[in-house]
């Protein structure tokens, strides 16, 4: 019954479009909802993540950069506090409605490489998900997103 009531309350206040977060930090609220809690973002991350552990990590606050627009993509970059070089992730979403790709790097588990995932499947490797201020999403990832996977 509580879930039903929650759906009705949510139906009265639609979540903001993902593009409303561009220029804001992922934890900043737009219409009372952070990017991490935006239902569309959560669904797209769930569809891209290869497992529950990575999905949970990506949907958790960390050290953030402002959400950017890269061409037709919304790009959010986050890392683990005090371990940004060792544990970082990026979410790239083809606006307005997806699909999404996730870059994930855990230096303790991945031998220095980062992996890009779409639809739960690894589609490529890179040196890292982000270095310093900005790293563009690789062209191969953008092409896969544009094709719908």
Regions found by a protein language model. Name each.
Residues 75-81, 104:
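Short beta-strand segments that buttress and anchor functional surface loops
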Residues 92-95, 105:
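Solvent-exposed alpha-helical segments and adjacent loops
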Residues 12-74:
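N-terminal secretory signal peptides
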Residues 1-7:
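Bacterial N-terminal signal peptides
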Residues 101-108:
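Catalytic Cys-His active-site segments of thiol-dependent hydrolases/isopeptidases
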Residues 73-74, 98-100:
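Hydrophobic residues embedded in beta-strands of well-ordered beta-sheets
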Residues 83-90:
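Short, surface-exposed coil-to-beta transition loops
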């Amino acid at each position: 019954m509580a879930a039903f009531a929650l759906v009705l309350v949510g139906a009265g206040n639609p979540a903001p479009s993902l593009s409303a977060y561009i220029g804001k930090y992922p934890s900043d609220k737009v219409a009372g909802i952070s990017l991490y809690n935006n239902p569309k973002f959560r669904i797209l991350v769930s569809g891209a993540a290869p497992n529950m552990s990575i999905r949970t990590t990506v949907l958790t606050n960390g050290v953030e950069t402002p959400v950017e627009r890269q061409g037709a993509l919304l790009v959010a970059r986050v890392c683990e506090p005090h371990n940004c070089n060792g544990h970082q992730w990026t979410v790239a979403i083809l606006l307005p409605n997806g699909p999404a790709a996730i870059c994930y790097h855990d230096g303790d588990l991945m031998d220095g490489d980062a992996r890009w995932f779409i639809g739960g499947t690894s589609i490529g490797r890179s040196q890292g998900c982000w270095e310093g201020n900005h790293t563009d999403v690789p062209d191969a990832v953008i092409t896969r997103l544009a094709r719908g996977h």
